[in-house]
Regions:
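Hydrophobic structural segments
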Residues: 1-119
């Protein structure tokens, strides 16, 4: 059985979170690290549509490039965009791992892929 922490450990080996830029908030941001993963979604951003798709597909994890929580989350209410997303995901047992600037600068990461594509 694969759990959230297994996937986070694997991703952290490819693009260590310690390499993120100072302003960034990459890493395991929402959820239960011990939860089993049968389905996961990959997204650029965790939008309401992505969360809805995860719910419909009964996914336990969303891995995104851009962080779900970027600035400090001072409250989590349905009146706040980030708070509403976190609450909805928690209610449906969906975790979030976000790999941003650490994936940009990792060997074989986003910057390397862009350079290869551009020649």
């Amino acid at each position: 059985m694969v759990i959230i922490n297994d996937i986070y450990t694997f991703l952290n080996e490819i693009a260590p979170v310690r390499y993120q830029m100072d302003f960034d908030n990459a890493g395991f941001l929402v959820g239960d690290g011990g939860a089993a993963v049968k389905k996961a979604l990959l997204a650029l951003d965790i939008t309401d549509a992505v969360i809805t798709e995860a719910i419909e597909l009964r996914a336990q994890l969303i891995v995104s490039h851009h962080p779900l929580i970027f600035t400090p989350l001072r409250h989590a209410t349905t009146d706040d965009l980030a708070g509403r997303k976190v609450l909805t995901m928690a209610r449906h047992g969906i975790s979030a791992i976000c790999m941003h600037t650490n994936l940009d600068i990792a060997d074989g990461g986003v910057n390397d892929a862009l350079m290869a594509a551009l020649g």
